[in-house]
Structures are given as structure tokens and as C-alpha cells.
Amino acid sequence: MDNNEKEKSKSELLVVTGLSGAGKSLVIQCLEDMGYFCVDNLPPVLLPKFVELMEQGNPSLRKVAIAIDLRGKELFNSLVAVVDKVKSESDVIIDVMFLEASTEKLISRYKETRRAHPLMEQGKKSLINAINDEREHLSQIRSIANFVIDTTKLSPKELKERIRRYYEDEEFETFTINVTSFGFKHGIQMDADLVFDVRFLPNPYYVVDLRPLTGLDKDVYNYVMKWKETEIFFEKLTDLLDFMIPGYKKEGKSQLVIAIGCTGGQHRSVALAERLGNYLNEVFEYNVYVHHRDAHIESGEKK
């Protein structure tokens, strides 16, 4: 059995954690539909015992997802140490997924569901303070996550699609590059590892015929690409990424999020994200996906 076959035969454990209200339950439901054995809110101290069960070769535990959150606050503090210990001592492949969202979006979701945040301590603490405290408590586990997903702008359907994209394919290459266009006026892409600002390029918005279109339209794309500044920028950008991306993979990252922003996220960033996605697909044998976060907002299209 070669090394690739050995890797495929190993059991896989995905620890799903993150901010309350960011979508952990939805992710667990999605993974369960995809055939994962799912456990909700396992105390971190029991994680090594659970991994021991997985190592016994039970077929039903070959792919496992465990949701862990701050409901057991004291127990949660040991999570990073436990994950590190299990990774160093077990043959089980362990990934950590961290879900987050903006404070404003989390507040909105809690108001919609009328549920109490687990750290509100029966009304002794305000919702915004509970969210801020949780964000602080989770900063360490976030720092070791293989996947960080910002669900602020994602609908439940879009979040499920992203999870399926990552985990549904048995032959899935473990390194994924997500290229996202966005508009600065709608907020920065919070889960981005690299952010590039292209607002210095000539803006198609000021060409009347191009204003209602997006960077997905040929006329807008050609307008953005015809400038010398664009060519110089793209050449320097790809040189940088050619150097950096292999290093990210070598360091054990499973995902790299590259965000390209312009003013509204409709023209320049969309065109360049498309071009970059095509380039990365040609140069690397990784999974490359392109997403346009705000193009539909500015163009007036329905999502």
C-alpha cells in the first residue's frame, strides 16, 4: 500500500466550532446528510477517548464530525491542548473548522430566533457583551483552524453548498483556494487570508453603458483588462501568489481565501477575481473556486 492509499484508509475527524449563531448546527446537519457520523457538543476532555474508538476501525466511524462550543465554558478551555495532543499521538486525520460572523449579523440572527446566547448568564450580560466575550475566548482555537468560514453574507443554502464542495468528494484534494470579489462599501471579506484592493484601477462605473453590468460581462471585463495598470498589477499579483501558495500548503493550511475588493464589488474586483481564478486553475492542481459576494447587490440582480 503506497502513502496515498494509506492516507485514504485513515479515519477522518472534523471538529466544528466557532461563534454561537454562526451556523454550526446547519453544518452538522449538512455533514450528517453526507454520511458523516455526527456528535453535537462533545466535551473536549472526551475527544481522546472518542478518537480511540475511531482507531479501532469501526466502519461507521470512518468519517466523523463533532460540534464543540462554549456551553461547557470551563471544559472548552482545554480544547486547543486536546486537539494538539490528539494530532501528535493519533493516526486519525483531524481538521478544525471555525465558523464566524459579524457582531451585527449575530445580533440580527438572535433577534430573529429569540433565543438567548449561551454566555448571557440568564440576562446578567447583554447580547453584544456575550458575543464579544465569546469571540475573545475562541481566538486561540480560531488560530489553529484549517478552515475559517465567515457566514455573515452566506444564506443557509450557500453555506451548505460550500460544505458539500469541501467534503463531498472522496478524491477531494485537501488544499482549496477560494477567490472572492467584494465591495469595500459593503464591508471587508472577514475570512480572507489575503486582501487586495483594486480601487486604484480605472472604474467602469463612470462609463454609462457599463454601469449596470458586472465584471462577468465581456464589455466590462475587457474594459478593466485593457489598462496598463491592470496588466502590471496582475503580473505582480500572480508572481506573489506563485511564491506564497506552495508555502501556505507546506505549512498545513487546508484552505486559502484570496479576496479582491473594489468600491462596490461589481466591476473591477469581479473581473480580476475571474481572471485570477482561471490563472490559478491553470497553474496549480488544487481546487480553485471563485465567488462574487456583492456583484448582485450593485447590479440589482436577484440572488
Swiss-Prot record:
This is Nucleotide-binding protein SAR0820. InterPro entries: P-loop_NTPase, RapZ-like, RapZ-like_N, RapZ_C. Transmembrane segments: none annotated. Displays ATPase and GTPase activities. GO terms for molecular function: ATP binding; GTP binding. It comes from the Bacteria. ATP binds at G18, L19, S20, G21, A22, G23, K24, S25. Pfam families: PapZ_C, RapZ-like_N. Keywords: ATP-binding, GTP-binding, Nucleotide-binding. Belongs to the RapZ-like family. NCBIfam families: PRK05416.1. Disulfide bonds: none annotated. SUPFAM superfamilies: P-loop containing nucleoside triphosphate hydrolases. GTP binds at D69, L70, R71, G72. Coiled coil: none annotated.
